[in-house]
Amino acid sequence: MKIDDFSHWVRERQQDVERALERWVSDDSPAGLGSVMRYAVLDGGKRLRPLLVMAAAEAVSGDAAAALRAAVSVELIHAYSLVHDDMPCMDNDILRRGKPTVHVKYGEAQAMLAGDAMQALAFEVLTPDDGMSPPLMSALVRLLARASGHDGMAGGQAIDLASVGRQLDEQALRDMHRRKTGVLLQASVMMGAACGPADAAALAALSDYGAAVGLAFQVVDDVLDVTQDSEVLGKTAGKDVDQNKPTFVSLLGLDAAQKYAHDLRDQAHAALARSGLGQAAYLACLADKIVERDN
């Protein structure tokens, strides 16, 4: 696929997501809460998870309206997790997406409430009164809940907090980041796939693809934390080193970590090749984008 075609597709889908978020994240919530939510989720971020949802849905000729709802719900969960992760009781960060973190701008209480509200809104978006079949609705809710709950993102963050100052082996580090970061990216792929017809072999291959790009994203994050500055990243660089957190760079070394990211990208491409899907080019390009990004 030509890079211009992919870039055009990315811009169009990002605009679709941005318009949907503008519509669903209301500014009229009580006591200014809507403004805090909009600050947290609008006008920033790569929208990678929504792009994975929509690329997977298109790969299986899925329902575009359902895929857009799934894409927005995943981004709301991601945004809520960033708001909470940045708070002083967690990672205590002051910069996110090139601007002050939510608790720095609005205070800890409003940040906590905004995160809670976005989490709830994510599931409201997935449960419309009409226009989506109950089985699809149930499947999407289950995928997102499992990815974001105790056995997924929240559990991974708990491991992350408990691992400060500790040396994890590669298996333990993979497990932590699979939960904290990887499963939501994998769920994004599977939520998109759920929006259309796909046989068991294709679903298994897409799950493998999602697992590979999910872990690759975190490996690249670890690399960028030591190779880029805060202005490029849009968040505080060097935080993992400063907080003595285990990373793939600290465990494997920079060169080996970079090679590992490329190996995972190759695994993602191999999974797509065995999926039997003829419209998976955008997923392949997203795997490249994840590994080759600079922020």
Where are each of the predicted segments found?
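N-terminal amphipathic/basic leader segments beginning at the initiator methionine
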Residues: 1-25
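Mg2+-dependent prenyl diphosphate-binding active-site environment of isoprenoid biosynthetic enzymes
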Residues: 22, 29-269, 277-291
